[in-house]
Every structure is written in C-alpha cells, then in structure tokens.
Amino acid sequence: FVAVKTPEQSDLLSLHRIRSRLVRHRTALINQIRGILMERGITVRQGPAPMRAALVEILSQPPSDLSPRIRRLLCELGEDWRRLDYRIDAISDEIETLAKDDTACQRLMTVPGIGVITASAMVAAIGNGHGFKQGRDFAARSEKCSTPVV
C-alpha cells in the first residue's frame, strides 16, 4: 500500500527533483570546464572550490596561452555556474524554510547525520511514516535493506 501524497508533499518532492537536476547540471558544467582546461595542459584539483578559484585566477590574468575564444567560453561557463549556484541556493533556502515549519522534518533532523535536505526529502516521499508498520518496511521501500521484508 502506498499512501497518496498530499499537495504539499508533491510540491516539496518537485523542489527536490529540480534541485537534484540543477546539482547534476552544475557537476557536469564543472567537469566540462575541467576538461577544457586539461586539454590545454592546465590541471586543477578535484572539487568545486579549487575549480572556482582556478577559473577566477585564469580569467583575471592577461591573455596567455588560451585563445580569446576559449577565454570567452570559460567566462560564459563561469556565468552559467553562478546562475546554477543562485538557483540551487534559492531552492535550498525554500526547502529549509518549509522544513523548519514541518514537525516531521524537525523530528527527523534530531537523528545524527540527517540534515534539512535529507529530512525534507524523506517527508516528501513518505509523509509522516504512518504507512509503515515497522522500520524494516521503510528500509525495504527505500531499498536500503539487504534482506527482503517477508
């Protein structure tokens, strides 16, 4: 039995799906920038922070070995990255605001390791959890359990 989602749950789930897509796009964009730089012999440590710092440094220097076209493309990709960050932050803020007003989210966030995003995603997916007889049922539903529930 799967409970019908409330309109609020559906809205929250949509926010999570959109945020997840934006995060995937940002990761792909960062990897694309990394690839462009690597093709030109410029290596950057893994992670968004080193890449952002390297991109700012590269674009702030006078033209060097990078062609004007690549500099322009890198600048445009940097702008795309900023727009994605802005949208991700806006949706994350909205999710956080909704989670602060939800008692189920607040309860879940008392569990060590569960933050706003995880708690609100769980509430969006399963509501208050009353549809499960025991914790194992939830684990089986979320595919986090290695043994099937009989």
How would you describe each model-predicted region?
Residues 1-2:
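A polyampholytic, Gly/Pro-enriched intrinsically disordered region
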Residues 107-150:
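Phosphate-backbone recognition surface of nucleic-acid-processing proteins
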Residues 5-107:
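Glycine-rich, often acidic, oxyanion-interacting loops/wings at catalytic, nucleic-acid
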